[in-house]
């Protein structure tokens, strides 16, 4: 049978993400090795937080297209606000029927074709993880020990500060493409010229990147505000009469 698929052409425009920090030159007296490690750690953390927020919430306007954005064919793109957010799916439990239905949506492309589901990730903020996810995914085994993050379909649960309370994202990480240019951990530069008279040195880190989902069904935007606690249902069965 003739293969009917073809190459897909995607317009990619990378955006610049940068962060900076200023220090007094007198701080070099603390030790250049210590100060260098401290500044690099701060700048790398700032860069990581910026990328994380862009991957989750990015509007596509001078930033990546985030997982929560609606990118279906024909969606209205605003030149001032970018792509709109997806409509949230209310989820009150993680029973096999409910959770299987969510994963089934990921298994179908926007054009209606079937897609193999490999790795699945659930994003939640740290507070919701302990208040909502832990009660809904923790069970006690026959040995008296608790098993956490138990879901009907194997899923990696990742905490992120980029989501608001009550929100969650279920997505296929292999279907989100983050395209970064330049050095993997960003490029760090410094200058003493900006505030020369104040004896201040500025350090800057920058990274060029963009990202988007393959299509609109690679990620689901969930409302877990009313997620219920998991209860193990025990059914009593009468023993047969001998």
Where are the model-predicted features located?
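Extended active-site and interfacial segments that coordinate phosphate-rich ligands
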Residues: 1-4, 222-228
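N-terminal glycine-rich phosphate/pyrophosphate-binding loop and immediately adjacent elements
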Residues: 213
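Acidic/polar, low-complexity extended loops/arms that serve as protein-protein interfaces
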Residues: 1-99
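Extended oligomerization regions of viral-like shell subunits
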Residues: 61-207, 231-242
